[in-house]
Amino acid sequence: MDIQRSILIVALAVVSYLMVLQWNEDYGQAALPAEVSSSTAATPALPDTPADTASTGGDDIPTAVAEPTAAAVAPTAAASDELIRVKTDVLDLAIDPRGGDIVQLRLPQYPRRQDRPDVPFQLFDNGSERTYLAQSGLIGQNAPDKSSGRALWSSEKQSYEMADGQDSLVVDLTYSENGVSYIKRYSFKRGLNPQCSAREQQLKKPGCVDPSAYQVDVRYLIDNQSDQAWSGNLFAQLKRDNSGDPSSTTATGTATYLGAALWTSDEPYKKVSMKDIDKQSFKETVQGGWVAWLQHYFVTAWVPSKDSTNLVQTRKDSQGNYIVGFTGPAVQVAAGAQGETGAILYAGPKLQEHLGKLSPGLELTVDYGFLWFLAQPIFWLLEVIHGLLGNWGWSIIVLTIIIKLIFFPLSAASYRSMARMRAVSPKLQALKEQHGDDRQKMSQAMMELYKKEKINPLGGCLPILVQMPVFLALYWVLLESVEMRQAPWMFWITDLSIKDPFFILPIIMGATMFIQQQLNPTPPDPMQARVLKLMPIIFTFFFLWFPAGLVLYWVVNNILSIGQQWYITRKIEAAAKPANA
């Protein structure tokens, strides 16, 4: 009995240690920034003029080999420094005409806070407190973007909005220089299905929100009417400062992973943290690939053509900003001819299935940690259940039942072993009284008793340990999946991804652990018995800050376990009565 309990306690301690170790390795970040005040009633509008930190050229722009040393680019007469506003049903963004970069972007379908649904989460920003933007351009001989300055693009309007009934929106920026005309074309898609109700759209019901609407197709159309050939390279990159992740407030108050990731020839998913970039830059030539910046629940990624050979790299500019991007192959346009190049920008939630379709390996940005091979099928099953029930809380309950059925034989073996141990508890107590403090003789006598009664002292422990990886995998599923963000269950549980605001579920969980403990055999060691009695209290304390969805899983699992264990225990005790008569 001592061996069984000791192994179980040590195993739980080891698992907890590994969990904390992995968490620190993957998610340890700097302290979070203070939350932006939302005391005003209306959503604050994006500013119409770019911040002073907007790029006008410098070491944040990659330098092409053939780039000439020239004076700063002269803007066209009709160009303006005023930001160009673009609004679709899922994106609200601003483009800086200097360089044509997306410097601000909001997600109207993802409120920053649940109690303020009118304030959308802001992904990109280029203000005095935070720098995070998506840059792209053309570099090389006679190309418009140089380290000495960026092109100043023109547009027909200063504001574009996708109208009702409109399925797409195209925003063209124009620029001309040295007989070459350029169009930088942003193409957007409608995301919300008008056949769905506003509530169904808000809950992200299947078929109500098109994930591809978070993709922005960025194309460069080049019309070379000069008398010489034109050559240039497309570059696209994400630039960010070292400010904290505004979306990373988790149930435990711990910051999740914030950093770059990219596809390489050797690794379909390579994380490059800010610390890694501080130490050294990274460069590699790949076929296709992608580059991304990760934060809790959301990801931005540049995806070039899968058929192109690209130089992917990470670096740090002189202003301390971190950059991850790629430079494409040279584009040649003969005199009097036209050419084009481009890439896809994804800026939105971490939607695993869609990201995998967009580019191989991009689905791994939904980072489930070292148990991803268990977490991915668990999430798939959870998503299937949600498609039938339409509520993530009830889906977790059904998932718990299914997992319990899968592990039913193992659990039954564990409970049978515990029931037999419970039945021989009086004999164990007698052995303790017989041998006193002689632990060696006590252990030998216990082993002989286990052998005589055909009891495996590890029988109640190992089945529980087998289930621990599933529990940890589910933990990461609930933590990392954006589908759980602000997902309600019922009554007071309005967000399954954060802690229970009234701590009701953790208290219920502690009560179920206490009840289940009464069904287990009492260890002969009084000190061990006292420690085990404290376990429900200790677990309740730690679970106070766990995601409500995870605590819900544990509560339902405990209730099912109590029923199963009670039935098996009573059955074995009933069978033992005639034998003892």
Curated annotation (Swiss-Prot):
Region (Disordered): 41-62
Any GO BP: protein transport
An annotated GO cellular component: plasma membrane
Membrane topology: Multi-pass membrane protein
Keyword Cell inner membrane tagged: yes
TM segment ranges: 7-27, 365-385, 388-408, 458-478, 489-509, 536-556
Database matches in Gene3D superfamilies: 2.70.98.90
Pfam families: 60KD_IMP (PF02096), YidC_periplas (PF14849)
Subcellular location: Cell inner membrane
A GO term, aspect molecular function: membrane insertase activity
Keywords: Cell inner membrane, Cell membrane, Chaperone, Membrane, Protein transport, Transmembrane, Transmembrane helix, Transport
Protein's UniProt keywords contain Chloroplast: no
Major subcellular location class: membrane
InterPro entries: Membr_insert_YidC (IPR019998), Membr_insert_YidC_N (IPR028053), YidC/ALB3/OXA1/COX18 (IPR001708), YidC/Oxa/ALB_C (IPR028055), YidC_ALB_C (IPR047196), YidC_periplasmic_sf (IPR038221)
Family: Belongs to the OXA1/ALB3/YidC family. Type 1 subfamily.
Function description: Required for the insertion and/or proper folding and/or complex formation of integral membrane proteins into the membrane. Involved in integration of membrane proteins that insert both dependently and independently of the Sec translocase complex, as well as at least some lipoproteins. Aids folding of multispanning membrane proteins.
Subunit structure: Interacts with the Sec translocase complex via SecD. Specifically interacts with transmembrane segments of nascent integral membrane proteins during membrane integration.
Matches recorded under HAMAP family: YidC_type1
Record protein name field: Membrane protein insertase YidC
Species for this entry: Ectopseudomonas mendocina (strain ymp) (Pseudomonas mendocina)
